[in-house]
Design a protein with these regions (language model features):
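Short active-site loop/helix that positions an aromatic residue
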Residues: 79-95
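Short, well-structured hydrophobic secondary-structure segments
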Residues: 64-84
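Active-site and NAD+-binding cores of ADP-ribose-processing enzymes
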Residues: 2-5, 29-31, 50, 92-186
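Short helix/loop capping segments that flank catalytic or ligand/cofactor-binding pockets
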Residues: 36-37, 83-85, 117-118
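ADP-ribose/NAD+-binding catalytic cleft of ART/PARP-like enzymes
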Residues: 1-70
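A structural signal for short, well-ordered beta-strand segments and their strand-loop junctions
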Residues: 26-28, 74-76, 107
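Alpha-helical interaction segments
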Residues: 16-18, 75, 161-162
Length: 186
């Protein structure tokens, strides 16, 4: 299990038998290397442009093409879960970039006219289907640490809201304006 710093361990306050409580505050985990750009430009869909550029160059070097896709901004209602995603971002970047990047958690407070655009991420079904997915394993550990049984979800039959409530998976299918984002960690 990941060593989530104490200041982000909010599952004890959010997690119930029904899953993670949802309110108007969202979190996004990423690398500290991206914070200065996010502070100026917000969180852009398709994520890490530098990492995408490196992937495109690598594919060109080996004679293959790379088609960049536009992905939404992935969110969660838990700082603890966002930290897990931030660790993944740092690990992904460490393969291609040198430096001392750290996981950071960003808080997102959307204006009223944008709040209803946050949707449950049913694309997470792939993680549920794959035995041994590390995020699902970490999530199981969080449930266990809080004395709650991990939900037995059938990804084909699960209600959309289960992906949000039980797995903490949501998305926002547009860029998040900079004025809506604050840094929770450094």
């Amino acid at each position: 299990m990941s060593d989530v710093p104490t200041q982000f361990q909010d599952a004890k306050d959010l997690l119930t038998e029904d899953g993670f409580a949802v309110n108007d505050v969202w979190y996004h985990g990423t690398s500290s290397a991206l914070w200065s750009s996010i502070k100026e430009n917000g969180i852009n869909r398709s994520g890490d442009r530098d990492l995408n550029k490196k992937a495109k160059n690598t594919m060109a070097t080996i004679g293959n093409s790379y088609t960049e896709t536009i992905q939404p901004v992935f969110l969660t209602q838990s700082k603890e879960l966002a930290y897990l995603w931030a660790e993944k971002a740092v690990k992904r970047r460490s393969v291609r970039f040198e430096g001392d990047e750290m996981p950071v958690v960003l808080e997102i407070r959307l204006p009223d006219d944008l709040k209803d655009r946050v949707k449950p991420d049913v694309g997470a079904a792939a993680m549920v289907m794959i035995s041994g997915d590390d995020y699902i394993g970490q999530l199981e550990d969080i449930y266990k640490a809080n004395g709650i049984a991990f939900p037995d979800m059938d990804p084909v039959k699960a209600d959309r809201m289960e992906y949000l409530n039980k797995l903490g998976m949501a998305y926002f299918d547009q860029n998040v304006p900079a004025e809506c984002v604050t840094l929770v960690s450094e």
